[in-house]
Amino acid sequence: MSKLMKGRKIRLAKACEQNRRVPAWVMIKTNRAVASHPKRRNWRRSSLKV
């Protein structure tokens, strides 16, 4: 794997990790004040600048 591809793979993995829902315990702790997060990304609707 080249250096360029490795960097891209790491950035894609980071984007994949960030694209998760808010944990259930956070919703319970905040009485559903925090129910969703605005940086949620759909793979079809928006493109990544990786």
From Swiss-Prot:
UniProt keyword list: Ribonucleoprotein, Ribosomal protein
Gene Ontology terms: biological process: translation
InterPro entries: Ribosomal_eL39 (IPR000077), Ribosomal_eL39_CS (IPR020083), Ribosomal_eL39_dom_sf (IPR023626)
GO function term, MF aspect, one: structural constituent of ribosome
SUPFAM superfamilies recorded: Ribosomal protein L39e (SSF48662)
Superkingdom, natural source: Archaea
Key word Ribosomal protein present: yes
Pfam families given in the database record: Ribosomal_L39 (PF00832)
Keyword Ribosomal protein part of the UniProt annotation: yes
GO CC field: ribonucleoprotein complex; ribosome
Family: Belongs to the eukaryotic ribosomal protein eL39 family.
Protein's recorded name: Large ribosomal subunit protein eL39
Species name: Methanoculleus marisnigri (strain ATCC 35101 / DSM 1498 / JR1)
